[in-house]
Regions:
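Alpha/beta enzyme core
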Residues: 2-10, 22, 35-40, 46-163
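N-terminal start-of-chain detector that recognizes signal peptides
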Residues: 11-17
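N-terminal intrinsically disordered, cationic/polar leader segments
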Residues: 15, 30-31, 36
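Acidic, Ser/Thr/Pro-rich intrinsically disordered transcriptional activation regions
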Residues: 17-18, 23-25
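Short clusters of hydrophobic/aromatic residues that line enzyme substrate/ligand-binding pockets
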Residues: 28-29, 58
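Short, flexible, glycine/charge-rich loop motifs used to bind or transfer phosphoryl groups or to couple energy/partner
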Residues: 29-30, 155
Length: 163
């Protein structure tokens, strides 16, 4: 027989809250603190000037032209968000079977990165090394006549894009 007498039911019916009693102890044992400095803001960029286009499947999110991208980036920097992830909307006429637009130095993604780094050198700019935005077929690789990804050719294309 135990020398202790419980006035409450044992665990799990009663769970003590002692670690949550004081604000300082709640901070010490909390799992996660999320601040703007922990965020990466996704941005969808399209060709043109002074353009904003709603993305129907993503309420409140827009595709923006580079000039509008810079306006939004200024606000993000002010808010303390340290990085953006860019997703280009490649015009259909720039897409090809071999995804050459992926490494075009004057391509939309490349111009957007340069503009952001010129105006906001402290802002982290993340891009996706992927070919699907640049291929006419939408595959994330260079395909053969049967629709299979040709790995060696795709790898070389991804290397060109990354550099």
């Amino acid at each position: 027989m135990s020398q202790f007498t419980f006035t409450r039911a044992p665990f799990p019916q009663t769970r003590m809250r002692r670690l949550r009693a004081q604000e300082f102890s709640r901070r010490l044992v909390q799992e996660t603190v999320l601040t703007p400095a922990d965020l990466i803001y996704p941005m969808f960029v399209l060709e043109g000037e002074n353009r904003r286009e709603a993305i129907p499947s993503m309420l409140g999110i827009e595709r923006v032209s580079i000039d509008q991208l810079l306006l939004e980036a200024a606000e993000l920097v002010t808010l303390g968000i340290p990085a953006v992830a860019l997703f280009p909307v490649t015009p259909p006429e720039a897409k090809s079977l071999l995804a050459e637009e992926a490494w075009n130095t004057n391509g939309l993604a490349q111009r957007a990165v340069r503009a952001l780094k010129q105006h906001f050198p402290q802002l982290g700019v993340i891009t996706d090394v992927a070919l699907d935005p640049f291929t006419t077929h939408g595959q994330d690789g260079i395909i053969d006549d049967n629709g299979y990804v040709i790995n060696d050719v795709t790898t070389q294309a991804l290397i060109k894009q990354a550099l």
